[in-house]
Amino acid sequence: LAKIVALVNKTLKTHIGDDAVELSSQDVVSAINKGKSTGGAKGKHWILDPVDGTLGFVRGDQYAIALALMDEGDLKVGVMGCPNMPKQGDVLEFETSYSYGFSPRLVSKMLAGDSLGWYKGCIFTAVRGHGSYMFPVDEKLNFEPSKVTVSGAFDPQKAKFTEPVMKANSSQGFTAAVATNLGIECKPLRIYSQVKYGSVARADADVFMKFPKAGYREKIWDHAAGVILVEEAGGRVSDAGGAPLNFAGGRYIEGLDRGIIAASSALHE
């Protein structure tokens, strides 16, 4: 706890300066405990997943810090930090790799690219009606935010698709059957966390599909930030029946029809 309190105070001083009030451990704990809202359709709600993709984080693989603002049931802002996400999507090996992690070969490929010192660490931002943008996690790198857009691909047979790594709450077999029926020939790129949404938003992948196993309820913090990022990048996110995801029902996505699909608007149709 002491390390967390020290980091909080350091961050406050960095952004506020000498006027920042130093917080005690009890102050920090009290602030954390305020995050007990049950959500809902009324008012403004911050939707936070502080470490999305916990297993990816532990393994040194993909994870995200994901934050979204919902106002009267509608997503308005999304911010997602992806510390291990490669800057360049073309380093991904869809045909030979099932992982978005850091094998020695992948690291070599990332470093060999035209990354100008920025080879990993991406922050995505989106504001409703203003598009989605990406810039480096490392603030010392001098890069202006760049606008990201979803893939223009329309042919399902050539589509690159991504899905969750974990089988515990996602039916990879069902997803594979859907991909086969659509004629998708590419192997899936399996990624921890909402980095999957970032991959679709900047066109590393054309489609994200997740079909949860029976009885599993999708939590809003696992999707909110990623959904607005894809939508503001020109994509569409819905359940398998084509309905928008409902974030206004509380802590869970209510009324979900079978699964979640995120893609470019043209391909989604």
Model-derived regions, located:
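Conserved catalytic motifs of the protein kinase core domain
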Residues: G43, D74-K76, G121, D257-R258
